[in-house]
Amino acid sequence: MSSPISAVSQMLERNQALFVGKRLLVCGALEDDYPRQLATLTHSLTVFTTDYCYYRSQQAALGDAILFDHQLGGAPRFDALLLLMPKAKAEAQYLLAMMTPLLEAGAELFLAGENRGGINGADKLLAPYGDKPVKRDSARRCSLYHGELSKPVEPFELDSWFGRYQCQAGDTELTVLALPGVFSASELDLGSQMLLASLPAMQGSLLDFGCGAGVIGSVLAKRNPGLKVTMVDINALALESSRRTLAINGLQGEVWASDVYSDIQGKFGRIVSNPPFHAGLKTFYAATETFLAKAPDHLQSQGSLTIVANAFLRYQPILETHFKRTEVISSDAKFKVYLSKV
């Protein structure tokens, strides 16, 4: 059964004639079943997503037409691109730089998104690739822009898109590499700083949930030689960033995609996280609540969960429901660090 489609997709439904018969590549902030409709209109459809949760929700319906990864390569083979505007402008630039080499000369460029989400910067985003785009539609506080690939494009070079900075967490210095739009892409956030300052020496096995650029897991791996570190995230750009952060610091760890605990087997001595609570432009608690509630099932006996969260988020009642003991081990006006034991 299909789910309700977003306001952006409702606007696109009004303009479906634009996609008929196209060899269409779709990417960006995908969040609903609308690509299934596109599959019935186009000559061929390829959906590229960096969101493992979305990939899992659509893979059965779309099959080989949907791809999950941090990059897409190959020869030019598409005559149209539909980019659904991501929250981060830098991520939109990354996707355009990656996808335009896969387009034939003269291919059509479509950008769609919510007005409050940066879509009205389409002129500047598309300027490197062609003339000024036309606004095709504006509805439900969303806009659709239409341009043409009329300028030559450079081959996509993944390495040039990694940001790099030095991170200091207590006595531990780390080099961080991160792709656009990834959490902790440009600096160590204050919440993660508080979390890392609250953690003791550790051994055994550790799960870094929602790893972002890999800062938390990498700092703990560097502080605790012999600690077996596993990092998971739903974002393919975060996963590749974490792999690079581990590698550049000479650290070992396992990194893979998991939708909460979907791909996690075995149990850990510790789970540590600065859990995400935003999805796109919307605050999103459900995945984090599932993460907290199911954590005891993935902890060894005497295992523990340590998280940092914005002080206004009501996570303590959830933790107290599912763990034998929960305490706040550090806090200030903005953040709280919770330690929960099974």
Swiss-Prot record:
Cellular localisation: Cytoplasm
Reactions it catalyzes: guanosine(1207) in 16S rRNA + S-adenosyl-L-methionine = N(2)-methylguanosine(1207) in 16S rRNA + S-adenosyl-L-homocysteine + H(+)
GO CC, alphabetical: cytoplasm
Record EC number: 2.1.1.172
A GO molecular-function annotation: nucleic acid binding
Alphabetized InterPro entries for the sequence: DNA_methylase_N6_adenine_CS, Mtase_sm_N, rRNA_ssu_MeTfrase_C, RsmC/RlmG, SAM-dependent_MTases_sf, Small_mtfrase_dom
Alphabetically ordered keywords of this record: Cytoplasm, Methyltransferase, rRNA processing, S-adenosyl-L-methionine, Transferase
Protein family: Belongs to the methyltransferase superfamily. RsmC family.
Described purpose of this protein according to its UniProt entry: Specifically methylates the guanine in position 1207 of 16S rRNA in the 30S particle.
Quaternary organization: Monomer.
NCBIfam families: PRK09489.1
Protein name, per record: Ribosomal RNA small subunit methyltransferase C
UniProt organism field: Aeromonas hydrophila subsp. hydrophila (strain ATCC 7966 / DSM 30187 / BCRC 13018 / CCUG 14551 / JCM 1027 / KCTC 2358 / NCIMB 9240 / NCTC 8049)
